[in-house]
From Swiss-Prot:
Residues 6-185 form the Guanylate kinase-like domain. Keywords: ATP-binding, Cytoplasm, Kinase, Nucleotide-binding, Transferase. It is found in: Cytoplasm. The keyword Cytoplasm applies. PROSITE patterns: GUANYLATE_KINASE_1, GUANYLATE_KINASE_2. This is Guanylate kinase. It catalyses: GMP + ATP = GDP + ADP. The gene is gmk. It is an enzyme of class 2 (transferase).
Length: 207
């Protein structure tokens, strides 16, 4: 089974739903074998974040230059900031047989779906929009106006749930993590993926 190509795992959901917290919980687990593809952004670094670990932080000018060079799988402008996924790392890592984990915005996930239709798309949903607003207020990093803008955007994003393969409600971080890991494990056992590997093995055996 060494010939299996890596799976592209795409986790997205509304701002404030806890994508980063769930992703950290997954990668703090020593049994996790996924490779994390660090996204790039022009937003300000938050307290506790590390450049090159949580995001690659760039200026708007630097980001736009990379767009012109076609260096992104996807990118989107969200609440005045750019977010994007550098392309080469993802392709190389999957080709080497490793699963690649993306934590991106909903608009970006739509672009990835077009380029990687076989990827695994997971929507991380809040228990409710009120709960989401409480999380955003609790951050203490944005104005009331910006928080309301994010909540309004979240309403639209929840309506786009049908673009995803699975929905995981982030009611408890450790439960969300376990649900995502179970989904990925099941995806590797899908008949289409396993059948393709065995067909390749049978062809090689005939040589």
């Amino acid at each position: 089974m060494d010939n299996e190509k890596g799976l592209l795992i795409v986790l997205s959901g509304p701002s404030g739903v806890g994508k980063g917290t769930v992703r950290k919980e997954i990668f703090d687990d020593p049994t996790t074998s996924y490779k994390y593809s660090v996204s790039m952004t022009t937003r300000n670094m938050r307290e506790g974040e590390v450049d090159g670990v949580d995001y690659f932080f760039k200026t708007k000018e630097e980001f736009e230059a990379l767009i012109q060079e076609d260096q992104f799988i996807e990118y989107a402008e969200y609440v005045g900031n750019y977010y994007g996924t550098p392309v080469q790392y993802v392709k190389d890592t999957m080709a080497a047989g490793h699963d690649v984990f993306l934590e991106i915005e909903v608009e970006g996930a739509k672009q990835v779906r077009k380029k990687f239709p076989d990827a695994l798309f997971i929507f991380l949903a809040p228990p409710s929009l009120d709960h989401l607003k409480e999380r955003l207020v609790g951050r203490g990093t944005e104005s009331d106006e910006k928080i309301q803008s994010r909540v309004n955007e979240a309403r639209k994003e929840v309506e786009m749930m049908n673009l995803y393969d699975y929905v995981v409600v982030n009611d408890e971080v450790h439960l969300a993590k376990e649900r995502i890991q179970s989904i990925v494990e099941a995806e590797h056992l899908k008949r289409e993926r396993v059948e393709a590997i065995y067909r390749k093995m049978l062809l090689e055996a005939k040589k």
